[in-house]
């Protein structure tokens, strides 16, 4: 049973890493465009207080 949960945990971490690379599904708050350049790939703009990472 522990092995099953370990495999699920690994799959969850890998899928989150893929989402982060392709565009995060989570809202990332920002104040300026430079805040987004550190948190998202591709230097996206900051609009309405959130990074446009997609």
UniProtKB/Swiss-Prot annotation:
Q: Which GO terms describe its cellular component?
A: extracellular region
Expression by tissue, per the entry, reads:
Expressed by the venom gland.
Question: Could you tell me which InterPro entries the record lists for this protein?
Answer: Scorpion_toxin-like_sf (IPR036574)
Highest taxon above the source species? Eukaryota
Q: Signal peptide position in this chain?
A: 1-23
Q: Which cysteines are joined by disulfide bonds?
A: 30-46, 36-51, 40-53
According to the UniProt entry, its GO molecular function terms are:
potassium channel regulator activity; toxin activity
Reported function? Inhibits potassium channels. May be active towards small conductance calcium-activated potassium channels (KCNN, SK), and less active towards voltage-gated potassium channels (Kv/KCN).
About its domains, the entry says: Has the structural arrangement of an alpha-helix connected to a beta-sheet by disulfide bonds (CSalpha/beta).
- What is stated as this protein's family in its record? Belongs to the short scorpion toxin superfamily. Potassium channel inhibitor family. Alpha-KTx 14 subfamily.
Q: What is this protein called?
A: Potassium channel toxin alpha-KTx 14.5
Q: Which organism is it from?
A: Mesobuthus gibbosus (Mediterranean checkered scorpion)
**Organism lineage string:** Eukaryota, Metazoa, Ecdysozoa, Arthropoda, Chelicerata
